[in-house]
Amino acid sequence: MSAIEHIRGSTWHGRKGDLKNAFRYSIDYLCLDIENAPPKKGIFKRDSGWLFGLYGSDHGGPVGDGRGAAWVRDVAAGYNIELPGKILLLAQPRIFGHVFNPVSFWLCHDAQDRLFLVIAEVTNTFGDRHSYLCKHTDLRPIQPSDRLKADKIFHVSPFQPIQGAYEFRFDIRPEKIGIWIDLQMPQGGVMATLTGPRRALSNFSILGALLRRPFGSRRVLGLIHLQALRLWWKGAKYRPRPTPPKAEIS
C-alpha cells in the first residue's frame, strides 16, 4: 500500500489515583508506508517542505537523527525477527516546519498483511526518546482484544514516577484505528487513548486541519504544559528529569 492516510483523531488522557485529571482533544495523525509512499501528494511533502509533511529523520532513532524504516528493520533483526510485510508509520505531521510527537507507532505486518509487531516511539518534552517493542512471544498476529505489556523505564511526565508497566491494546482496522495505553502502577497511573477514522489524505483534508488546528504540534506542546500547570496547581509532586535509559528500545 502506497496511499497516505489522514486520521482526524481524538486523544484522551485520564490520571488515575487520588489526584485525578482528565482531558480530551482533537489531533491529526498520518499513516503511511514510509518505504513506498510518494514523496509528494498535493500540499503534502515527504522529507522536504515546511507547510505540511513528514520527515523520516524525525522517526526511528534519536530525535532529529532518525533513520526511518531502516531503523525498524535493524531493531527487528536484533531480536531475530523478519519483517516480510509492510511497515506503516503512524505519526503527527510537521506543520509550518515544527513537529513534536509524544508517541508515534511503527505498525509492522506479516506476509499475510496482519499486524504482528508494534514499536511505540515515545518522546518527552526534554528531547529524550525511548521505544517499546510490543509483540507476542510467538509472533502471532495482534488481535484487537490482546493486551501487551512493557515495563515503564522512561521519564515522560514530571508528575509520574518511573515505575509500573504499560498495557497496550491495538485495534487497527482498514477503516479506523484505536490504540489504548494503560499505565498500571500500585497507586495511580494513567490511561491514554488515540482513536479515529482512516481517510485518504487530500489537499482538502490538509486545509481543513490547517484551519482547525493551525498550530499543529505547537498546540500539542501548549496543551501538555497547560495540563502540567493544572497538575501542579492541584498539588501533584514534581520530579526532575532523570538520566534517560541508554537502550533505545525495550
PLM regions and their residue ranges:
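Mature, function-bearing regions of proteins
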Residues: 1-250
